[in-house]
Regions:
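Rossmann-like NAD(P)-binding element
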Residues: 66-86, 99, 106
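Beta-strand-loop-alpha-helix segment that lines the small-molecule cofactor/substrate pocket
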Residues: 85-136, 150
Length: 390
């Protein structure tokens, strides 16, 4: 495997991959910054006795091409998500199986690239998996089965949450240029992360679209920036999604210290409800009719970590020549989050048809690792014209 993006998530995914199966190794690393590549190379040597020679350590905004062209079989792509569509596109062109960390796009242009590339990957018999680890987490998989069996009846709505304390940030150092600073602080900049509703909360939105089999047709929401320190993003969102059949999903996410936390999903049905915070299904009277058995999982399965299990399933699909292509499904959840974000930013109702056809592109023109016009990166204000919310 080659690893593209050697920060925290890329490093984590690299070790998840190595722990997922025998006979796998990492042979090439790429990142925008030399220190990131060298840090991961050092960890691989220390913990796994894997040597990454200097000629397999690639640096710069085009390092992804060098990793993909270095003779690898598969790629782990974990760069800031604005780059995901282009990196996936190149990997697919070169015939590589891909692990794409979520989110896999931050805007409609990226969404369309992902959807088109996913079709190409299928045509080439490539295995593509995304970092939506709940799809491989047994409590979620078993809950999905119970809901598909009709245990809660017909789904009538739900609420999904990712409310937590403030995420990490980087203060600018005087030796960093504009682009270098933003990439090192990427989770706080709209163009790089897509804002936290896309970058993080997509996990919870994805659970509802997965369990219901529905995509949203419109979104109305709001959000604000209360205590964020760097970047140009919001730190809270609340979105009402109307799904294809008319039911509603309420989505809320927050990254503010000192507030109540909740990372879970709740789905209501005509016969009962499911709550991921307890992994229980209750009937309409509030009686628990099913509960996931964590002790049985520990007793029956050697591996329970979902971050490793997603790599187990990816490797098994490649070795067993079994179809696996999650990019298009994840892209739909991603687009739902984008719809919610754009409604909050603008104060307008967004629709699936309009957003999927939108020319909105967050990637700066003529991007290079140097000076950028920082005045263009402003916090969105609802009710202002779209061209003032870039």
């Amino acid at each position: 495997a080659g690893v593209i993006g050697c920060g925290g998530r890329g490093s984590g995914a690299a070790f998840n991959f190595l722990n997922a199966a025998n006979g796998v190794t990492i042979v090439a690393l790429g990142d925008t910054f030399q220190e990131r590549v060298d840090e991961l190379a050092g960890k691989l040597k220390k913990d796994k006795n894997i040597d990454i020679p200097a000629d397999k350590r690639f640096v710069g905004l085009d390092a992804y091409k060098q990793v993909i062209d270095s003779g690898v079989d598969v790629v782990i792509i974990a760069t800031p998500p604005v780059f995901r569509p282009v990196h996936f596109q190149y990997a697919t062109e070169k015939g590589k199986h891909s692990f794409l960390e979520k989110p896999i796009c931050v805007d409609p242009v990226g969404y369309r690239t992902i959807m088109a590339t996913a079709k190409q990957a299928e045509a080439k018999n490539l295995r593509v998996i995304t970092g939506t680890q709940r799809h491989h987490q047994r409590p979620y998989v078993e809950s999905y089965k119970k809901i598909m069996e009709g245990m809660i009846g017909e789904i009538t709505g739900g609420t999904v949450y990712w409310n937590q304390s403030m995420l990490w940030f980087r203060e600018r150092q005087k030796e960093w240029n504009d682009c270098e600073y933003m990439i090192k602080d990427w989770v706080n900049w709209k163009w790089l992360s897509g804002d936290h509703i896309v970058e993080q909360h997509v996990h919870n939105i994805d659970v509802f679209t997965w369990f219901s089999g529905l995509k949203p047709v419109k979104a109305v929401g709001f959000g604000s920036r209360q205590r964020r320190i760097t970047g140009d993003q919001y730190d809270n969102f609340s979105i009402d999604f109307t799904m294809e059949n008319g039911i509603h999903m309420h989505s809320m996410c927050r990254q503010i210290d000192g507030c109540v936390s909740n990372v879970s999903e709740f789905i209501q049905g005509t016969k009962g409800s499911w709550d991921s915070s307890t992994m229980e299904i209750k009937d309409l009277a509030g009686n628990v009719v099913w509960k996931y058995d964590y002790e049985a999982e520990k007793a029956n399965f050697k591996q329970t970590d979902p971050y490793t299990l997603e790599h187990v399933n990816w490797i098994n699909s490649i070795r067993g020549n079994k179809p696996l292509q999650q990019a298009s499904e994840t892209a739909i959840s991603n687009m739902a989050a984008i719809m919610g974000r754009e409604s909050a930013y603008s104060g307008a109702e967004t629709t699936w048809d309009a957003m999927t056809a939108s020319p909105l592109d967050y990637t700066p023109k003529d991007l290079n690792l140097g000076k950028m016009d920082m005045s263009t990166f402003t916090v969105p204000v609802p009710g202002k014209p779209r061209d003032q919310n870039k």
